[in-house]
Amino acid sequence: MMQLKLEHYNIKIGQHKVLLNIVDAKELGVNPGDRVRIRGHQSLSAIVDTTDDMVPPGTLGVFTEVYEHFEDWDKPVEVVPSFRSKSAAVIKKMLDKKPVVQDEIKMLVSDIVDENLSDVELSAFITASYIHGMTDDEVEWLTRAMIDTGDTIEFDTHPIMDKHSIGGVPGNKISLLIVPIVAANGLLIPKTSSRAITGAGGTADLMEVLSPVEFSSQEVKEITEKVGGALVWGGATNIAPADDKLIKIEYPLSIDPYYQMLASIMAKKGAIGADNVVMDIPVGPGTKVPTVQEGQKLARDLINLGHRLGMNVECAITYGSSPIGRRVGPSLEVKEAMKVLESMEGPNSLIEKSAALAGILLEMGGAAPRDQGKELALETLRSGKALEKMKQIIEAQGGDPNIKSDDIQTGQYTADIFASTDGYVMEFDNKWIIEIARLAGAPNDKGAGVAIHKKRGEQVKKGDPILTIYAEKEIKLDNALATAQRTNPIIVEGMLLRRIPGTYGFQ
């Protein structure tokens, strides 16, 4: 045991970690990656790193996650070697493809949330599930543990409705229409959404154009019960916090383990008390689900997991080979969605998809008979009831309920991409559309993104603008434009694709 004084480094690193001078580490008999227990007015386990110059002997360097647990910073703390977390043994079992039990999964998720595992240990867990997969029981246990280790919302009124899109399609702004449509028909739909990680705008990024999106779980409940719906950022609610910690490791590895994805999606639905959930599964090249067959498997797995958790899940396999609507990027997409709410003016792909998925929820919730939900959704849009409900949601979340589509500002710097030939739009590259919008500044720069002037099958003439890039900063516009010119994300072909001459040519 050693008595050490504390020195705070005002940095959040996502885990309980401390710095020991190498002299003190040798005295304690610990190495980098080992654990120590810190005893002050409370006891805390932390992972060790060592240094020969950042902290002097007799001092324990602590980062913000540890700092927040202690109050008396003038008093020394006791530091003793600690045993490795039992979760490390569970992870090794998973790496060895050995079965685990529910209590082991619960302990593992608790250690993830409490930041008792190192990045190496988290990486091993992610790798194990990525390579070996998980059984149905293990996925259910993981989902339940993710729910139980975070905030939950318990509503007095049921049913609770929810919707989730698997993602991968640019411009998928449909939640901005679905939530007010469903809420306008007397159903509760507390939509917690993500911010974009690799996309040009998650639903939370979009809604932030209209109102604040960061609320506690209790505030989400109050907003939903007051106006029927909410569109908020899930990261502010502490719902399924284990998911955010796993994403931090998955992102640099560029992997998204299938069974962890299932648990992540369903944990967030379970935490808000959802009874009925519709899943949007876009399929096609460039999406997260390339084929209909893969979409059907994902649908079966989501429905099965929902059944195990007591949720009624329906899945919609949707067309994902080109953007939804004609705008990509927060302000551009919100402007497009608000125009639909205001006057039903907008791309058919946006209106049809939103009405179809909202219709499924209306049928699941008993607001519409079977096969009549879509028509009720369209009527809710046409009548202005969805717009009125959206205004109520915006106001309840602290925004201006009188905002109109024309009030929404887009990036001041623009550049066009022109068709290089007469012909028809044959193909979209979703990934490059998203990348161009991100290079322009989306989602952090709300006014950045792209406007798509011609969609698949539409005729163009040489010199017609087919894409406009919007940016708030000129240098970002230049970067996005250079990439668009290099990658050609919208393919235009003439009716004659290729001429192949005869073997002998003309005589």
Curated annotation (Swiss-Prot):
SUPFAM superfamilies: ADC-like, Nucleoside phosphorylase/phosphoribosyltransferase catalytic domain, Nucleoside phosphorylase/phosphoribosyltransferase N-terminal domain, Pyrimidine nucleoside phosphorylase C-terminal domain. GO terms for biological process: AMP catabolic process; pyrimidine deoxyribonucleoside metabolic process; pyrimidine nucleobase metabolic process. Disulfide bonds: none annotated. The keyword rRNA-binding does not apply. Its EC number is 2.4.2.57. Coiled coil: none annotated. It is an enzyme of class 2 (transferase). AMP binds at G168, S194, R195, A196, I197, T198, G199, T203, S264, K288. It catalyses: AMP + phosphate = alpha-D-ribose 1,5-bisphosphate + adenine; CMP + phosphate = cytosine + alpha-D-ribose 1,5-bisphosphate; UMP + phosphate = alpha-D-ribose 1,5-bisphosphate + uracil. InterPro entries: AMP_phosphorylase (IPR017713), Asp_de-COase-like_dom_sf (IPR009010), Glycosyl_Trfase_fam3 (IPR000312), Glycosyl_Trfase_fam3_N_dom (IPR017459), Glycosyl_Trfase_fam3_N_dom_sf (IPR036320), Nuc_phospho_transferase (IPR035902), PYNP-like_C_sf (IPR036566), PYNP_C (IPR013102). GO terms for cellular component: cytosol. GO terms for molecular function: 1,4-alpha-oligoglucan phosphorylase activity; AMP binding; pentosyltransferase activity. It comes from the Archaea. HAMAP family: AMP_phosphorylase (MF_02132). Catalyzes the conversion of AMP and phosphate to adenine and ribose 1,5-bisphosphate (R15P). Exhibits phosphorylase activity toward CMP and UMP in addition to AMP. Functions in an archaeal AMP degradation pathway, together with R15P isomerase and RubisCO. Belongs to the thymidine/pyrimidine-nucleoside phosphorylase family. Type 2 subfamily. This is AMP phosphorylase. It comes from Methanosarcina mazei (strain ATCC BAA-159 / DSM 3647 / Goe1 / Go1 / JCM 11833 / OCM 88) (Methanosarcina frisia).
